[in-house]
């Protein structure tokens, strides 16, 4: 931080971004390296996530498909909009 200016993304609350992308395709990467791609249905303050039309990828290869998937927030490394 120079001259009191915040760098991009620093100090921002992600809840606004997450509420804007509900209903859209997202990628969720877990701390284990497993990736889920699906339609974001909900996310709470603990980063617990509900997805629909979900695909699971392990080491880059599609492993399974799920109608609904629920991910506990403490396992989430990041969520990105696709």
Curated annotation (Swiss-Prot):
Q: Does the keyword Ligase apply?
A: no
Spell out the InterPro entries in the cross-references: Lsm6/sSmF (IPR016487), LSM_dom_sf (IPR010920), Sm (IPR047575), Sm_dom_euk/arc (IPR001163)
One annotated Gene Ontology cellular component of this protein: nucleolus
Q: What is this protein called?
A: U6 snRNA-associated Sm-like protein LSm6
- Gene3D superfamilies named among the record's database cross-references: 2.30.30.100
The subunit field of the Swiss-Prot or TrEMBL record says: Component of the heptameric LSM1-LSM7 complex, which consists of LSM1, LSM2, LSM3, LSM4, LSM5, LSM6 and LSM7. Component of the heptameric LSM2-LSM8 complex, which consists of LSM2, LSM3, LSM4, LSM5, LSM6, LSM7 and LSM8. The LSm subunits form a seven-membered ring structure with a doughnut shape.
- The reply to whether rRNA processing figures as a keyword in the UniProt entry is yes
Predominant location of this chain? Answer: cytoplasm
Could you tell me one molecular function GO term of this UniProt entry? RNA binding
User: Which of UniProt's keywords are assigned here?
Assistant: Cytoplasm, mRNA processing, mRNA splicing, Nucleus, Ribonucleoprotein, RNA-binding, rRNA processing, Spliceosome, tRNA processing
Q: Which cysteines are joined by disulfide bonds?
A: none
> From which organism does this entry originate?
Chaetomium globosum (strain ATCC 6205 / CBS 148.51 / DSM 1962 / NBRC 6347 / NRRL 1970)
Q: Where is the Sm domain?
A: 13-82
- Family membership noted in the UniProt record: Belongs to the snRNP Sm proteins family. SmF/LSm6 subfamily.
* Cellular localisation: Cytoplasm; Nucleus
Q: Which Pfam families match?
A: LSM
> Which BP terms from GO are recorded?
maturation of SSU-rRNA; mRNA splicing, via spliceosome; tRNA processing
- Function field: Component of LSm protein complexes, which are involved in RNA processing and may function in a chaperone-like manner, facilitating the efficient association of RNA processing factors with their substrates. Component of the cytoplasmic LSM1-LSM7 complex, which is thought to be involved in mRNA degradation by activating the decapping step in the 5'-to-3' mRNA decay pathway. Component of the nuclear LSM2-LSM8 complex, which is involved in splicing of nuclear mRNAs.
